[in-house]
Amino acid sequence: MIIVVGIGADGMTGLSEHSRSELRRATVIYGSKRQLALLDDTVTAERWEWPTPMLPAVQGLSPDGADLHVVASGDPLLHGIGSTLIRLFGHDNVTVLPHVSAVTLACARMGWNVYDTEVISLVTAQPHTAVRRGGRAIVLSGDRSTPQALAVLLTEHGRGDSKFSVLEQLGGPAERRRDGTARAWACDPPLDVDELNVIAVRYLLDERTSWAPDEAFAHDGQITKHPIRVLTLAALAPRPGQRLWDVGAGSGAIAVQWCRSWPGCTAVAFERDERRRRNIGFNAAAFGVSVDVRGDAPDAFDDAARPSVIFLGGGVTQPGLLEACLDSLPAGGNLVANAVTVESEAALAHAYSRLGGELRRFQHYLGEPLGGFTGWRPQLPVTQWSVTKR
């Protein structure tokens, strides 16, 4: 059995009697250097510090035989090693004794409800994944440099007036809180930030809605326009944790919107044009999502993480591309393809005749001035084919 004991900045004094007894009876305890240093002299077990990288060492543990003990920060099941151990060895082989999490402590200090506060971990993720356009979050830092890195990004993307609080050594005798704005922290960061810190951010509210308008994206005209983007996302039907392949991504607007739809949604964007690939990267960073940007399809398919859903927004008439997309889909996965030319529309109609699914055609109009009046200007019709792989 692997017993995981959560410990806070207050060390042994903050632990329950059950947690203290487990540590005192242990023969071997694994943990980080900081966590192991929190144990007192009543713990006589041999102490093993995790190496870097840590995962191979974790995978080498064996829950069979004598009990193994692991110390972890706060609640080990909240972006912690407890979740990793259960995934590797099963819940029957892992017992978790949680401590109060840094998230709970930070919310208590800020006066925020935990249930409606987003939690973002930057322990291994890039800082741009914590950029938001409104709301509030507790951000778990990777190290002392994380607050400045996030503050700089928020400032660069027009969110510099976001309320920005850095809370260090939560629950311990050296606890400290510093309040300000992202801009102030980016311009004049303190030099004495503790490695053990979290960031409480109240993001500057963006005027733009969650369905971002076309002008919110960097693009050269190759973008799924807003009304069709809404219809396309409805057809793609994202669910939490799914991965999208955006093939012929253009600006990456579909990939970005997909990643913003549900927690855990990720995307891989395939685009042959280098300038457009740069736009996709810029748009992903601006919206605080992570999109894996790759080259031309289908050549770049081989080493990409497998998709749950595929959107084909360009290249419908490219020989073999539609078939390669279908081959890459798992059984039960959805493919949605849009077409605006007669040739690409014919290709989708042919695919529909062979494979079934649903074939739709959308036509929308925009009201525009016509002299002293208003007239309707038709936009290009869009044909959409969606199919579930059997």
Swiss-Prot record:
<dbReference type="Pfam" id="PF00590">
    <property type="entry name" value="TP_methylase"/>
</dbReference>
<dbReference type="GO" id="GO:0046025">
    <property type="term" value="F:precorrin-6Y C5,15-methyltransferase (decarboxylating) activity"/>
</dbReference>
<dbReference type="InterPro" id="IPR050714">
    <property type="entry name" value="Cobalamin_biosynth_MTase"/>
</dbReference>
<keyword id="KW-0489">Methyltransferase</keyword>
<keyword id="KW-0808">Transferase</keyword>
<protein>
    <recommendedName>
        <fullName>Precorrin-6Y C(5,15)-methyltransferase [decarboxylating]</fullName>
        <ecNumber>2.1.1.132</ecNumber>
    </recommendedName>
</protein>
<dbReference type="InterPro" id="IPR012818">
    <property type="entry name" value="CbiE"/>
</dbReference>
<comment type="similarity">
    <text>Belongs to the precorrin methyltransferase family.</text>
</comment>
<dbReference type="InterPro" id="IPR000878">
    <property type="entry name" value="4pyrrol_Mease"/>
</dbReference>
<dbReference type="GO" id="GO:0008276">
    <property type="term" value="F:protein methyltransferase activity"/>
</dbReference>
<keyword id="KW-0949">S-adenosyl-L-methionine</keyword>
<keyword id="KW-0169">Cobalamin biosynthesis</keyword>
<dbReference type="InterPro" id="IPR014008">
    <property type="entry name" value="Cbl_synth_MTase_CbiT"/>
</dbReference>
<dbReference type="InterPro" id="IPR006365">
    <property type="entry name" value="Cbl_synth_CobL"/>
</dbReference>
<dbReference type="GO" id="GO:0032259">
    <property type="term" value="P:methylation"/>
</dbReference>
<dbReference type="InterPro" id="IPR014777">
    <property type="entry name" value="4pyrrole_Mease_sub1"/>
</dbReference>
<dbReference type="InterPro" id="IPR029063">
    <property type="entry name" value="SAM-dependent_MTases_sf"/>
</dbReference>
<dbReference type="InterPro" id="IPR035996">
    <property type="entry name" value="4pyrrol_Methylase_sf"/>
</dbReference>
<comment type="pathway">
    <text>Cofactor biosynthesis; adenosylcobalamin biosynthesis; cob(II)yrinate a,c-diamide from precorrin-2 (aerobic route): step 7/10.</text>
</comment>
<dbReference type="GO" id="GO:0009236">
    <property type="term" value="P:cobalamin biosynthetic process"/>
</dbReference>
<dbReference type="GO" id="GO:0009274">
    <property type="term" value="C:peptidoglycan-based cell wall"/>
</dbReference>
